[in-house]
Amino acid sequence: MENEGVAKVERYRSGGTISGVVGMAAVVLLLGWGLVSNNDGMAPWAFPALVLGGVLVWAILLRPSIALHRDELELRNVLHTRFVPFARITAFRIDQMTVVEVDGKRYVGSGFGRSRLTINRDAKVGPDAPSDRHSVGWLVEEKVRRRMRPHDAVAEPGQVRREWAWAEIGALAVLALATLVTLLVA
């Protein structure tokens, strides 16, 4: 899909979005209540602990996803992201989690999956049924399988890369330490 000359990235995630938004809203409300209440407010250690909880909600419920780029699959997990070129993928499936195999190695994406019930429904419908009868997971599987075929037999596909989520890792470390220090000092 092209949009004004730029390839559109298709991003998919499982059902943690609503829980994540509710969790983040709860963190913001509790922080606001703690800031506006005078003497009966929260303990000093509760502030960094709440922000730590917010970062955990973000990292566990909102960050994980999979994305289909033009030439590669992005598996975004809690603390790292893998970029897998479509031409290198030897096997791909979406069960409870997304599983990608490349040269005998398995890479798992926790951001998108299907329930057993959905997997069984997709199997009963069959591959020749109209696309509106299948789940989103089945449709994503088919999109990836179509892209797995090498586009250019001459060009060497890129390597599988991992990028750490340094912002989340740093925030978790600093906030855990701040919570511990304020708990011990206060």
Show which residues each predicted segment covers.
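Short leucine-rich amphipathic alpha-helices used at interfaces
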Residues: A43-W45, I60, I66, S110
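Acidic, Ser/Thr-rich low-complexity segments on the non-lumenal side of membrane proteins
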Residues: V84-S115
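N-terminal membrane-targeting/pre-transmembrane regions
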Residues: M1-N39, E142-A186
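Short, compositionally biased leader-like segments
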Residues: V36, D40-G41, A67-H69
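Short, basic, glycine/proline-bearing loop/turn elements
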Residues: D40-M42, F47, E72
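Conserved beta-hairpin
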Residues: G53-I94
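Single-pass alpha-helical transmembrane signal-anchor segments
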Residues: V28-L29, A46-L61, L175-L177
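A membrane-cytosol interface segment of integral membrane proteins
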Residues: R106-G158
